[in-house]
From Swiss-Prot:
One of its GO terms (molecular function) is GTP binding. Its cofactor is Mg(2+). This is Uracil phosphoribosyltransferase. SUPFAM superfamilies: PRTase-like (SSF53271). 5-phospho-alpha-D-ribose 1-diphosphate binds at R78, R103, D130, P131, M132, F133, A134, T135, G136, G137, T138, D199. It comes from the Bacteria.
Length: 209
């Protein structure tokens, strides 16, 4: 799976340990999601193209660089909303394209129900964000939708991933890079990542019952 990028960093591993803990409260969980995403984005943006520009400092004019391409962040509703704030810290000019998928608990398949993209979406690099990469079904459907809409460059950022989902995704879209902070043991009979961290959406929005 040459398109899979496993990000290894001491800070990420430390924060991920606390994130997994069932006793981590919702406020701290949200903060950790934000911080881990922030750190991962440095690696995911490593190959962004730059263009020449000039900047006037208080004492002189100098040649410099700035991003050459427009960015579109595509959070998969709802859990990925917890990752969105950290993206804006690094890419404040990015546009947002929302993708809505609802998991069917019986079939374990994701049902597409909503999309809202910026008008110039086909001109932008799309960074799809979703904290959990389990069966790979949602990721495949999201990338298929974006490609059908004319988006040419797509990256995927997910905090945790299962090997089953990564293998399935790579067979369909070997051209799309997936960045993850951990590849866990696998999936259980309900399609949840093991050992994982539970339902990320429920823990972000404090709807665990």
């Amino acid at each position: 799976m040459q398109n899979i990028r496993l990000i290894s960093h001491p800070l990420i591993e430390h924060k991920l340990t606390i994130l997994r803990d069932k006793n981590t409260d919702p406020f701290q969980f949200r903060m950790l999601i934000d911080e881990i995403t922030y750190l991962m984005l440095f690696e995911a943006s490593r190959d962004f193209e730059l263009k020449d520009t000039e900047v006037i400092t208080p004492v002189a004019t100098t040649k410099s660089k700035k991003l050459a391409q427009k960015i579109m962040i595509c959070p998969i509703l709802r859990a990925a909303l917890g990752m969105l704030g950290s993206v804006f810290k690094l890419l404040p000019d990015a546009s947002v394209g929302f993708l809505g998928f609802q998991r069917d608990e019986k079939t374990l398949k994701a049902e597409f129900y909503y999309a809202k993209l910026p008008k110039d979406h086909a001109e932008r690099i799309a960074i799809v964000i979703d904290p959990m990469f389990a069966t790979g079904g949602t990721a495949i459907d999201a990338v298929r939708f974006l490609k059908e809409k004319g988006v040419k460059k797509i990256k995927f950022i997910s905090i945790l991933a299962a090997p089953e989902g990564l293998n399935r995704f790579s067979e369909v879209y070997p051209d799309v890079e997936v960045y993850t902070a951990a590849i866990d043991r696998g999936l259980n009979e309900k399609g949840y990542i093991i050992p994982g961290l539970g339902d990320a959406g429920d823990r972000v929005f404090n709807t665990v019952y």
